[in-house]
Amino acid sequence: MINKKSTIVVTGAAGFIGSCMAGYLNEQGFENLILVDEFDEDEKELNLHEKKYAVRIERENFFDWLDIEKPDIKFVFHLGARTDTTEFDYAIHQHLNVDYSQKIWNYCTKHNIPLVYASSAATYGSGELGYADDHEIIERLQPLNPYGISKNEFDKWALQQESKPPFWAGLKFFNVYGPNEYHKARMASMIFHGYHQIKKDGFVKLFKSHKKDFNDGEQLRDFIYLKDVIKMCYWFMENWQQATGNWKQAISNGIYNIGTGKARSFKDL
């Protein structure tokens, strides 16, 4: 059973989503956190300001540290990834988004630790197969960039595994915006960039449409506020144990969309 003294791992803990996950866990009374990331950027360091945790570990040292320290981990939020959609060196995505995630999965499986990991709506590509979080379409999805491909490759791998954690969920985040994305530069959300453009210039530049069915600025996206994403992640941790009992609303292992379910245009924003 998870209680307020339980040890919880958050990867990507200095980043956009991970730092807010750590902060929300603190708000709920969890302070025995193991934070994993690359802690080499001053702006990311600001994301950890006043966060309470037991220890923080450099990403590439994490598994060696686990072998030595053998902590009694009760839950893992694997939120770290290379999220740059303009990074076209697939080897980087393979290492960070596939291989590293497989090591997290295997560790959780071996030590009987429930796992929530970040997938992405980028796996849906141009949406030609729709956006349903149906496991049957995952093999046929056609992501548009190496980031989306790597996320989909791990999703496919996870679904194929016979050995698995006691509970696992891959969460396909849609277009997330909110606090602590200042360090992301060009990869910050459209809402972040739009806000600062309006403050500076009095207007916002919208993306040109490359589809004849949509005029410029009328492209549709599902924008979801970061704190809503965090609450959903936490909900899985709170409720996964019901999945092993006879509760009539038991949570199944698998891959889930995390969005509002409603698309909005850039002009509307």
Place the predicted regions along the sequence by residue.
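Catalytic helix-loop patch of NAD(P)-dependent Rossmann-fold dehydrogenases
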Residues: 95, 99-103, 110, 123-170, ...
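N-terminal Rossmann NAD(P)H-binding glycine-rich loop of SDR-like oxidoreductase domains
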Residues: 8-28
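Mid/C-terminal beta-alpha module of Rossmann-like enzyme folds, strongest
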Residues: 191-194, 200, 232-269
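SDR active-site strand-loop-helix element
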Residues: 11, 36, 76-80, 115-121, ...
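A short helix->loop->beta-strand "cap" motif at the edges of active sites that frequently abuts
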Residues: 30-31, 110-113
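Glycine-rich phosphate-binding loop and adjoining beta1-alpha1-beta2 segment
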Residues: 34-62
